[in-house]
Amino acid sequence: SEWQANDYLEQVKKSVSEKEAAEWLYVERTKQNTSIEQPTPEKDESLTPAFSQPKRSRVQTFDLHPEIPLSERHTFDLASHEVPEAGKKERFRRNMEAIRVLKECEFDNRFATPEEQEILSQYVGWGGIPEAFDENNSSWADEFIELYTALSPDEYESARASTLTAFYTPPVVISSIYKAMQQMGFKEGNILEPSCGIGNFIGMLPSSMQDSKIYGVEIDKISAGIAQQLYQKTSIAAQPFEEATIPDSFFDAVIGNVPFGDIRVNDRRYNKHNFLIHDYFFAKSLDKLRPGGVMALITSKGTMDKENPAVRRYIAQR
């Protein structure tokens, strides 16, 4: 029995080394089919370079309507459909029209038509329009009621939160980023956009990079839904970046305009660093990038200028 084995171990310790006795006890327990679990040392993943971690062969994809053949799907050409500048009220009106079309597509369980895609592409989000969520602002009373009744409670809270973190990226900025990537030698590959909004970076992908596979992630359900309707052949997951199933060292490029703000993301792997949201996106995106890959993200100057060097140290270690 195991008790007898332990008793014998105490006796033989006097005549043999502790190592030999332990080896004998292991054999005796094995004979009795008694499993011995060796403790697994804790590993600090944050200090392990992404390129030295195991690489999975693929990332989990998302298809809104897998039953629809690719030949019947439409990809919106953003480059040839400029969104004109407008005041807050007009931007609100465009947003509401886009939401109406999105809701119709979701109710009918279908993809948007090319005509509907033009309306959807006018959506610019709620960054810079906090008045639409202010119930005490009399000059926006009608808009407040219209928006509040058009969205579900979760959609409304997500939209209101985005007024502080989400901002529209002008096409000229996106084009400049792609040109810089081309100058760095990037031609095609797996591309991640960790906060894709309605997919403007996807829509502005240069023709020279069209063989690339883009994976988008977007926490805001409305923005993600519009992106899925505009870029019907692209995998876009409507979920927080911290919950997305994405392997390390997988992507050839990471692009996008990450959310800014004095808030933090709850991600067990990164919590110890206490990163602000934009720094968190930088750090996690870098871990998803393969060695030699290209990362081109828009962030605040604080990432490189702030007194706390935590995120810069994290980047340097990679």
Can you say where each PLM-predicted feature lies in the sequence?
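Acidic, low-complexity intrinsically disordered tails
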Residues: 26, 30-72
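Conserved SAM-binding strand-loop segment of SAM-dependent methyltransferases
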Residues: 233-241
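Amphipathic alpha-helical repeat scaffolds
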Residues: 255-260, 298
